[in-house]
């Protein structure tokens, strides 16, 4: 019985097409990963789940502040002349806003204007923001983002004449 339940869970996960890891997202969507941050679930994980996350090399939240500074420095070095940077993805607005605020607070991006917007696949405002941006950063969360959605966003941004600097992944 346990094997059937586990097997059904694996099949459901695979058919849902959810992003599994930053490494898989990089290879599947051909997107550079700017950094990985702990998802809400990873921060709450205890005992066996926390141990499994550690074995898989997933972040636990203890280094998120340093990782955000590293992501900000990477963005600044990849787009040295970008004054206006858009952070976008198919995440809840609060999560996008919080990440944008953290990046904006980093020394390397403090002098630049960072904005956030919903996915370009569902928001006309996001399309306008992409057009106004000098650089675009995608954000994905393993708990809700799908490979197809991330890839479609990347392609839509390219059709709008912009390139995606990379992706921040919540694991």
Roles of regions detected by a PLM:
Residues 123-142:
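Inter-motif core of Ras-like GTPase G domains
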Residues 117-121:
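Short gly/ser/thr-rich secondary-structure transition/capping motifs
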Residues 1-112, 127, 141-171:
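Short boundary/hinge segments that flank catalytic cores
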């Amino acid at each position: 019985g346990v094997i059937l339940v586990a097997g059904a869970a694996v099949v459901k996960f695979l058919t849902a097409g959810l992003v599994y890891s930053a490494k898989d997202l990089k290879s599947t969507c051909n997107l550079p990963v700017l950094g990985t941050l702990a998802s809400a679930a990873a921060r709450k994980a205890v005992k066996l789940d926390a141990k499994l996350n550690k074995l898989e090399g997933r972040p636990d939240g203890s280094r998120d502040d340093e990782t955000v500074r590293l992501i900000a420095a990477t963005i600044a070095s990849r787009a040295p002349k970008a004054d206006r940077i858009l952070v976008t993805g198919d995440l809840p607005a609060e999560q996008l806003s919080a990440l944008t605020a953290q990046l904006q607070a980093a020394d390397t991006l403090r002098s630049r204007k960072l904005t956030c917007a919903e996915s370009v696949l569902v928001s006309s405002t996001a399309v306008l923001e992409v057009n106004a941006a000098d650089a675009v950063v995608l954000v994905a969360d393993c708990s809700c983002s799908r490979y197809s959605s991330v890839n479609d966003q990347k392609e839509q941004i390219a059709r709008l004449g912009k390139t995606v600097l990379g992706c921040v992944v919540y694991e």
